[in-house]
Amino acid sequence: MKLAYWMYTGPAHIGTLRIASSFKNVHAIMHAPLGDDYFNVMRSMLERERNYTPVTTSVVDRNVLARGSQEKVIDNILRKDKEEQPDLIVLTPTCTSSILQEDLQNFVEQASLNSMADVLLADVNHYRINELQACDKTLEQIVRFYIEKNRASLTLEKVKTLLPSVNLIGISSLGFHNNHDTRELKKLFELYEIILNCSLPQGTTVKTLINLPKAWLNILPYRELGLLTSKYLNKEFGLLSLVILPMGNINLNRFLKKLLFSLKLENNTITKVINIKLLKLLNLNWIKKEAIKSKLKRKKAIIFGSSNHVATLTKLLSKEIGLEIILCGTYCKSESKWFSEQVQNYCNKILITEDHTMISNEISKLKPDVIFGTQMERHIGKRLGIPCGVISSPIHIQNFPLSYKPMVGYEGVKTIMDLLFNSLNLKDRKNSFTLFNEII
């Protein structure tokens, strides 16, 4: 345990709460002391939704420490069951309350006897895994719970849909441009006449999870969230998964070809549509020329963030734009092997760390023309006078835009080109107020 000024990923209970609050009509009970209960405020501020965050804190106070938590936790579960009438209540401790070593599974079993909702204890180790790993684990646990429950009651849907269909897995609350990406992916599916069978966890109910086996294919745009679920569905039902982030021309084209091949939809007409769409995007090449023409030497970039976004963007900037990637890195240590394999041929140096001071020191030493990173790299860039485009969580409210800004699909290519053009070209333009300072 160490005191941290900045964390790229939060503690495990944040991951569990992200998944629980993504589902419709699911409520989370957080067994925690005051101070660990910042999730509600953070999510309300960033997501700006109409509804309240469905998370209640069962506060660990001096009375709980004296008498034990059982009565209070069970009372809170039953109270929320009566008030909110959810389909599922998820109980999670935090790393702090886990120190008490209480039998929370016993609390859940007792509460289930009098609760109309299903009650589930989040099965995560709060000392060994981080927010992203807890997201993945909690989603798999909820899917497994409802698959097994409905299999026992013989209500599980196993017959495939007549038309090609997919499950979209990994869209969650507080994800990087997740809601916009979902809309763009839905447009892609509609364009190629593919049915969206189920999108989870964001915006779906646990009752619809019985329909997961009906799909022909699982789509996982974000590698960090959904791999465990896809492995479980593959093991139980033989459902294959496509794990590609369709960001940029090359990856989008690769995604579409693999998607249509997997669904046996490839034909001359569809291939022609893909090529026409791709040609329109290639007309944006003038932005590439504008972005790199100001100096004769190649522009140098540093990229840091989540493994999936950084790996995809590194290839995009190197192959499609022609930037020299002098360093790329990730804070996802659990994905270090996969990440290194993906980027080793596209950058000069790889950095895998959760320490923001290491990336700050590298940026200061290497002096890139542009940075692409998280909110922390934005701060570092501002301090050093280097422009930064934000391409990955963790992020602040600027990167939860109300306007439509997907990072994937056809519109996502335009978003990335805007980000690239503004980051590279506008850094040397003087602000009007600075220019006319004496007059103003």
Swiss-Prot record:
Its main location: plastid. Its EC number is 1.3.7.7. The keyword Metal-binding applies. It catalyses: chlorophyllide a + oxidized 2[4Fe-4S]-[ferredoxin] + 2 ADP + 2 phosphate = protochlorophyllide a + reduced 2[4Fe-4S]-[ferredoxin] + 2 ATP + 2 H2O. It is an enzyme of class 1 (oxidoreductase). It is found in: Plastid, Cyanelle. Its cofactor is [4Fe-4S] cluster. Binds 1 [4Fe-4S] cluster per heterodimer. The cluster is bound at the heterodimer interface by residues from both subunits. Keywords: 4Fe-4S, ATP-binding, Chlorophyll biosynthesis, Cyanelle, Iron, Iron-sulfur, Metal-binding, Nucleotide-binding, Oxidoreductase, Photosynthesis, Plastid. Transmembrane segments: none annotated. The keyword NAD does not apply. It comes from the Eukaryota. Coiled coil: none annotated. Substrate binds at residues 427-428. Protochlorophyllide reductase is composed of three subunits; ChlL, ChlN and ChlB. Forms a heterotetramer of two ChlB and two ChlN subunits. Belongs to the ChlB/BchB/BchZ family. This is Light-independent protochlorophyllide reductase subunit B. The lineage of its organism: Eukaryota, Glaucocystophyceae, Cyanophoraceae, Cyanophora. The gene is chlB.
